[in-house]
A protein has these predicted regions:
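Conserved, structured core segments of small domains
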Residues: 1-96
């Protein structure tokens, strides 16, 4: 199942800078691992915002939820999720 996900990060203004740096480093490492294994198919920064648009490929809604919950920055994110399916007018069978 493909999901389009918008993630907006909202770190508290008073968060310890070292803790924020650790969370960001851990987030980057996990995001890159998920990209390498094909779970996190696309990752795009939204210009001018601490936010991204992503496409995930997971087996179920539950797996999508679990994947997002394991992100180190999850507690500080506003997340919007939409399920995706192939459009009948698309000239491509896949996006890879």
């Amino acid at each position: 199942m493909l999901f389009h996900v918008k993630m907006t990060v909202r770190l508290p203004a008073d968060m310890d800078p070292e803790r924020a740096a650790r969370l960001k480093a851990d987030e980057k490492a996990l995001a890159q691992r998920l990209q390498r294994d094909g779970t996190w198919r696309h990752l795009w920064r939204i210009a001018g915002h601490y936010a991204n648009y992503s496409v995930f490929d997971v087996p179920s809604v539950e797996a999508m939820h679990e994947t997002l919950m394991q992100l180190p920055l999850f507690p500080y994110m506003d997340i919007e999720i939409d399920g995706l399916c192939r459009h009948p007018s698309s000239i491509h069978d896949d996006d890879r």
